[in-house]
């Protein structure tokens, strides 16, 4: 029998650089309350959000993703031609084909790099990180560009006062490459498909049947999500730490999906994180950007000096599906 030839494998992978872009319009809680029946104080108390970013009409998922990716590429010192693959995590690309990754690859001049989108909802970036890690370690790629990007303001239901204030627009990107030492820990991922209706986006036929709708809208059962996050997500975060062979005290930074500050606090307490661990609260002036929240938070924490190159960080995303994915990484 003729054997199948395989490519040389790499030992490990790591994050090389990051970049981010945010919607240019700042929407404060006060302004939000002119659109919905609520108060700025109630929104902040329930979520930790004081303002969020909405993109303008000219700011698209393609343009924001390209901006974040270009920054990451410049910081990496690599040439565009060296990128072997681009993975874009998003639920906001309204054209099923071609992929958003293909559009961004064209803008960046990535040539014949493999390009595809991934729908992992709010866990999309962590899913994509796991794929990039596997691609590199199996020899399928040397450098992978991973992007999380969303324009959720288009899909926000302003008639739903329980969710309208949550969502935001932006993009985060990272370049992942081969490494001689472990830079990305084993992923802990999975789903609870019996909870499909807990968070969902309307299908296009339903949305298009309503003359008042331009895009499908988000529907979420907030209490059910909170209950799930308190139990299952907290458990999976602990598993990701254990899979990396470390303890909570070894962490420098905890960067969960920026869904709600109360969820972040509950998971942090469950993990028994010591005071030495910096916990990300990027949601305060960013809002919830689904697949973009983790990479945006990583980049902003690095740029603001809240985290540093070489730090050990636990990242975890969770959202519609219900899906989750998390791993320990070393920051670039």
UniProtKB/Swiss-Prot annotation:
Disulfide topology: none
GO molecular function: 3-oxoacyl-[acyl-carrier-protein] synthase activity; beta-ketoacyl-acyl-carrier-protein synthase III activity
Active site: 122, 257, 288
Keyword Heme on entry: no
Keyword check for Lipid biosynthesis: yes
Reactions performed catalytically: butanoyl-CoA + malonyl-[ACP] + H(+) = 3-oxohexanoyl-[ACP] + CO2 + CoA; 2-methylpropanoyl-CoA + malonyl-[ACP] + H(+) = 4-methyl-3-oxopentanoyl-[ACP] + CO2 + CoA; hexanoyl-CoA + malonyl-[ACP] + H(+) = 3-oxooctanoyl-[ACP] + CO2 + CoA; octanoyl-CoA + malonyl-[ACP] + H(+) = 3-oxodecanoyl-[ACP] + CO2 + CoA
A single GO cellular-component term on record: cytoplasm
Associated pathway: Lipid metabolism; fatty acid biosynthesis
Keyword entries, A-Z: Acyltransferase, Cytoplasm, Fatty acid biosynthesis, Fatty acid metabolism, Lipid biosynthesis, Lipid metabolism, Multifunctional enzyme, Transferase
A Pfam family it matches: ACP_syn_III_C
CDD domains registered for this protein in UniProt: KAS_III (cd00830)
Subunit structure, interactors included: Homodimer.
Notes concerning its domains: The last Arg residue of the ACP-binding site is essential for the weak association between ACP/AcpP and FabH.
HAMAP family given in the database record: FabH (MF_01815)
Role played: Catalyzes the condensation reaction of fatty acid synthesis by the addition to an acyl acceptor of two carbons from malonyl-ACP. Catalyzes the first condensation reaction which initiates fatty acid synthesis and may therefore play a role in governing the total rate of fatty acid production. Possesses both acetoacetyl-ACP synthase and acetyl transacylase activities. Exhibits relatively broad substrate specificity regarding the chain lengths of acyl-CoA, and can use branched-short chain CoAs. Can use butyryl-, isobutyryl-, and hexanoyl-CoA as preferred substrates over acetyl-CoA.
Protein's name in the database: Beta-ketoacyl-[acyl-carrier-protein] synthase III
Organism: Cutibacterium acnes
Gene name of the record: fabH
